Amino acid sequence: MKRLGREFYNRDSLIVARELLGKVLVHEIEGQKVSARIVETEAYRGIEDKAAHSYGGKRTPRVEVMYGGPGFSYVFIVYGMHYCFNVVTREEGNPQAVLIRAAEPREGSELMAQNRFKKSYHQLNKSQILGLTNGPGKLCRALSIDKSLNGEDLCGSKLYVAEESQESLSIVTAKRVGIDYAEEAKDYPWRFYLEDSQYVSVK
């Protein structure tokens, strides 16, 4: 699989969010590879977007990586326990990002099962199998993504997104999830998901 280059990420988050669908997120951990096919994303358009951490040009140590240019990871924690993985888009100084909300397991399902449920994959029931990666926090836990990977270069060899040959995709557009604080921005249709995937977090 071909790794995505910097130019892929150096575009508006709305474009990148759609085009990440069907791509494969890969994390190489001490010689072991875990990967998952991206099936749900959300675009955050930075300074103009009331749902974005960088809205209004907000610049704190937490969001600094969003200002650093395209193709880097932005990992933050919610509720004090769940990590969320984002890819930074647009040029330096234009703090946009795409949240990866859900994915379908590809490689390393045994490690994912241990990370999520402390069980072997063959011990999981159907609900647990779908629950491996069908939400942003679940995805991060399954793929061993945490705060230590904040700012990771996604054009490197440790954490990256790769192309996968695929047929045409049926993409659904919807409102983003869990941003009721964002006033009118909570209604923007900036969430995208694959219609036929069972791993989408919310339909």
Swiss-Prot record:
GO terms for molecular function: alkylbase DNA N-glycosylase activity; DNA binding. The keyword RNA-binding does not apply. One of its GO terms (biological process) is base-excision repair. The keyword DNA repair applies. It is an enzyme of class 3 (hydrolase). Keywords: DNA damage, DNA repair, Hydrolase. Its EC number is 3.2.2.-. InterPro entries: Formyl_transferase-like_C_sf, MPG, MPG_sf. It holds the Pfam family Pur_DNA_glyco. Belongs to the DNA glycosylase MPG family. This is Putative 3-methyladenine DNA glycosylase. PANTHER family: DNA-3-METHYLADENINE GLYCOSYLASE. It comes from the Bacteria.
